[in-house]
Structure formats: C-alpha cells, structure tokens
Regions:
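C-terminal lobe/tail of nucleotide-utilizing enzymes
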Residues: 2-21, 26-28, 191-293
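Extreme N-terminal, non-catalytic leader segments
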Residues: 2-44, 48, 58, 62, ...
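Walker A/P-loop NTP-binding active-site region of P-loop NTPases
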Residues: 34-98
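Short amphipathic alpha-helical segment that frequently serves as the phosphate-/nucleotide-binding helix
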Residues: 47-52, 179, 183, 214, ...
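P-loop/Walker-type NTP enzyme "switch/lid" segment
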Residues: 69-141, 242-244, 249
Length: 293
C-alpha cells in the first residue's frame, strides 16, 4: 500500500496503539480450550475458517466439537456437508428438549469431529450467555477443543458466543471496512475480559498488495496490534470446497496448507508463515506457461 494511504488509515483507526500480545512460547495450551471465531463484519470467511480450523484440529487427533451460534441463520452445517443429518439443535439442548449428545452430529469422515448445529427458526434471544456457558462447561469434560462460530454483529449472538470462551480468533480481510469492524470487536473482547485474541488475515492477494491496491499483512497487523496466527490466500478452491461441504484444510492447496498451519499454531507449534508472494508467483508462472501452449 502506498505510504500516504497507509498513514491515513493508521490515523483513521486510532491515535494510540494497543499493546501487542506476545506469541505463545511454544508450549502446548491447556486442554480443554474454547475458541470463538469472530469478526464483527459478515462475509469475511468466518464460518469457513471455523469449519477448517475444527476439521484441522480433528485431523491432528484432537477431539473437537464445532458449535454454530448463529441462531436463525445457520450455515456451518452446510459448509461441513452435514445439513441433512440434523435432528436436534443448540436451542433444543439449552431448553432441555434433548441431551447435548443427542444433538451432536458425528462427522463420518473424521472420527474426532462433531457438530452442534444452530436452530433455523428461532431468534438469537432463545439462548442466554449463562445457558451457553453452562453448556460449554459440560462439553469441556469431553472435548479437547470447542470451536464457536460467532454470528456477525455485536448483539445477543456475539454475547452468547464469547460466553465461556478462553480465546478468540479474529478473522478479517484486507479491506478498510472489515478491519474497522475487527478493531471494534477486539475492543469488545478486551472489555469482556477475553484477553487472548489472535488474528487471521483472510483472502490476501499478493498481486494486489504489490500494486498498492490492497493492504499487506503487515499493514493489517500494524493497525490491529494483536498476534497474527495465520494468513489465508484468496483461493478459488475455498469456494469449491465450501460448495461441496468438504473443508480443504491439510490438502495440497495453499489455502489448505495455511489453515493446517493455523491449527498447529493453536496447538502451540512454532510454524513459520507461508511465503504467499513466492508461492503465488510460482503458480502464476506455471499457469502462464500452460495457458500459452
């Protein structure tokens, strides 16, 4: 990004800087851990991130439950390809209509992965933060990781999703509106005593960064001043995998590798960031060679 534009954006967000949190010192985090995936703004890839992080941790032999907290607008079941197996949902559990084990959907592809779907015909006030925390405390006894897919916005759904969470993954894209919302969310997380927040920069395009048409990863980290846990390139394979209900984490795509590296960092491994500029240049070069034939 050109220097003047970058300086203007920095002033736009804040005059003072938030203190950066140190990276995890390579030590594995205490189990069980509850992670809320949030953003503030819709459409930045939060649900896709939740699906891939949950699936990746399950692939790494951790027992994982994904919880869709977006009551009334559930999507996580579709992204996971489990929409046809729903019998009970989150609201049924908190209202006592069923036990949580009856509502859990076991992913047949990954023996350690479960989904607790949201209700589609209720509103966000159907669940309170106290009820959500009580459910999470119960789930802690059985699962290594509990991943909460947070709805967009900062109202009741957000309050429910952060109740009982140990840390947050804040997902943003390199756009001013998305970063502005992420900045607000980080402040709200801190105000609610959720001090540990890690940043995922999604849909990064190095060709646009080089031309000054998109903020770089460093620009985004500089503005938000929280620990960067991963960057995911803009990849058409993400759209394909989402439409197919098959998370791509761990496959041979750049995005799949990026998501798996995020999962390993969550577990405390010291994994370097993918060199997206080098990889992108390599793949673009290959494409140009074959397209010219």
């Amino acid at each position: 990004m050109q220097k003047n534009n970058h300086n203007n954006i920095m002033v736009f967000f804040r005059n003072g800087k938030r203190k950066k949190e140190p990276r995890c010192g390579g030590m594995e985090i205490c189990m069980s851990e509850v992670i809320v995936v949030t953003s503030g703004k819709g459409g930045v890839g939060k649900t896709t991130t939740s699906a891939n992080v949950g699936t990746g941790l399950a692939k790494l032999n951790k027992k994982v439950v994904l919880i869709d907290t977006d009551i009334g607008l559930r999507n996580l079941d579709v992204v996971m390809g489990l929409e046809n197996r729903i019998v009970y949902n989150l609201v049924d559990v908190v209202e006592g209509n069923c036990r949580y084990k009856q509502a859990l959907i076991k992913d047949k592809r990954y023996p350690n992965l479960y989904l607790l779907p949201s209700a589609q015909t209720r509103d966000k006030t159907s669940v309170s933060p106290e009820q959500m925390k009580a459910l999470i405390d119960e789930l802690r006894q059985e699962f290594d990781y509990i991943i909460l897919d947070c709805p967009a916005g900062i109202e009741q759904g957000f309050k429910n999703a952060i109740a009982g969470a140990d840390r947050a993954l804040v997902v943003t894209t390199p756009e001013v509106s998305a970063i502005r919302d992420a900045d607000r969310i980080i402040g709200l997380l801190e105000a609610n005593d959720l001090k540990r927040s890690d940043l995922i920069v999604n849909r990064i395009r190095m060709d646009m960064v080089k031309k000054g048409d998109m903020m770089s990863i460093d620009d985004v980290v500089d503005i938000l001043s929280i620990n960067l846990i991963g960057a995911v390139p803009d990849d058409e394979n993400i759209v394909i995998s989402t439409n197919n209900g098959e998370p791509l984490v761990g496959n041979d795509t750049l995005a799949g590798q990026a998501y798996m590296n995020i999962c390993k960092r969550i577990m405390g491994e010291d994994i370097p960031l993918l060199d997206l500029s080098e990889k992108s240049g390599f793949w673009n070069k290959l494409k140009s060679i074959f397209s010219s034939k």
